[in-house]
């Protein structure tokens, strides 16, 4: 064995690798000897939360993953959904939380790079990106630095690669002070008959290394992503990867060309745990062994050890099982794109993962137990104490509700995110129909295609903390609702479950209940989960983040010319409310941000009502009755009306029902509701349709003038609303 493999395996070393004592004892039983240092690193990488899902796998299996349009669900690099005409959309969301807190630019950039590879590994050309970001309190000394670095990193990578960013979300809360969240989403288009998988097949076939050289960046990244932070966080900087979007663009083109050639048997990107994970996953899925020779791996640094090469997370790399008769043509493609193409091993029939380095065998492990048979835990969990319903009469009505509306529009929570998305290229590729800032981003399938895809990403973490089950339901419902506002049929979703330490029963309870809520909503709304990611141990010095189960979804428009957006209001339109008057103030931004009331149950999500209202909204959009649509969520009716006025630059004169106190009707966050701006002459017909479908529809106003005028309560000009809405973020960033 080489010197690095002669390192003594001590209890301290085992603990540094994130392995529990019982896990190490299981390793000893499994292999019948003490592991080498490199083998210890491999077990650490493959058995951590980031790669094995050992705390969440039991519960993830309960999610609905099948549907009429689902081609590939969880278990591959990305989910695959049929969109007709021989095409499919391939998509996934994944976290890069820990690296982005340590090194925000590179952490966020390589998060984008990793999810891009997940998508084009399947044979899809990326067409759209989103990101869901959570930062600490705006007055925390690191927050502005982290926002600037993360946004710059996302823009720097996605813009250079050439994929448009079409949506996303940002939250600020002190519970993210020590652990920010960076969740990146990418979707691509592929042919249904040209999807590529990671399952290796055939014995004695060449295993080929593709892409950039291997360095020491990211060594131990997967293990770091499965641990809490403490005061030694700055020492983890070397575990953050460094990305090169131009190399990734070349890798995309080379891979798609290789796939067109028909040379690919199986392919896997090198993400978390690098060469180790990609090789083990391909072999384990195909019931094959893998033998690698590290002397063949292209490296960019001298004297790299086997441990470093196996656990490096250098970016822009792939591993492929190749049809041997096409080696020459495949090699020529990669060299044409200036990328490395090196045969570093072969598939075997012995179900062993063997690694050679400088003539010696440094790894010899059972591949199935490393891969899809890693330990799975049924961790104890507890339910949170139920929050009482916050009654309307318990919530003070502030005297000047116009000032309240302006305050909320000019806040960290509710202000425009223009400062962020204007740093992203939202129009590259030329197919963007709806840019960020709307309910959902929309992209044409291709330049000469009538079809388009709608994308949204949603979660309300404060709801999830108060009631993880309802919060999980609401994340799905709001995503589904946002897609429906365009007229698109919601097809499927991907999840990104961000939580604290699952070894704490109260945190594990948040995860379990959120998954149950997500599953229930997805079943009722026919919105299957086809891919996803779990990020646990988001804690610093024992302080956990807010539970944040992000849901990103995709919908299909058969004819994008019938699409509507938030900004399409026309003078004289009737404004109608789908759903009842608002009344629920528990966990509302009115209660929290204006009155500092953090108690109370979140709004209940009636999934059957969500389904009925969404179907009705899509139907009337398809009939051509609607000029603009917007869902009602954070901030209730008041914020929704203000946003429509701001986006359309047209006024609305509205009147409340006066059945409830004004602050409840304006700022209640009851779910399953929409605002529609409709052609005035169809109002009576819409009322009849609503009655037939048992849908609550109320005319609450008209599009007129240049102010938001809510009778007897407030009058605010479009300019004043816009100034409040657009000014907070630039001021916060010092501009």
From Swiss-Prot:
This is Phosphoribosylformylglycinamidine synthase subunit PurL. Its EC number is 6.3.5.3. The keyword Iron-sulfur does not apply. SUPFAM superfamilies: PurM C-terminal domain-like (SSF56042), PurM N-terminal domain-like (SSF55326). It is found in: Cytoplasm. GO terms for cellular component: cytoplasm. ATP binds at residues 53, 92, 495, 532. One of its GO terms (molecular function) is phosphoribosylformylglycinamidine synthase activity. Mg(2+) 2 binds at residues 118, 269. It catalyses: N(2)-formyl-N(1)-(5-phospho-beta-D-ribosyl)glycinamide + L-glutamine + ATP + H2O = 2-formamido-N(1)-(5-O-phospho-beta-D-ribosyl)acetamidine + L-glutamate + ADP + phosphate + H(+). The keyword ATP-binding applies. Pathway: Purine metabolism; IMP biosynthesis via de novo pathway; 5-amino-1-(5-phospho-D-ribosyl)imidazole from N(2)-formyl-N(1)-(5-phospho-D-ribosyl)glycinamide: step 1/2. It holds the Pfam family AIRS. Keywords: ATP-binding, Cytoplasm, Ligase, Magnesium, Metal-binding, Nucleotide-binding, Purine biosynthesis. Substrate binds at residues 95-98, 117, 241, 313-315, 535. GO terms for biological process: 'de novo' IMP biosynthetic process. The active site is at residues 50, 96. Mg(2+) 1 binds at residues 94, 533. It is an enzyme of class 6 (ligase).
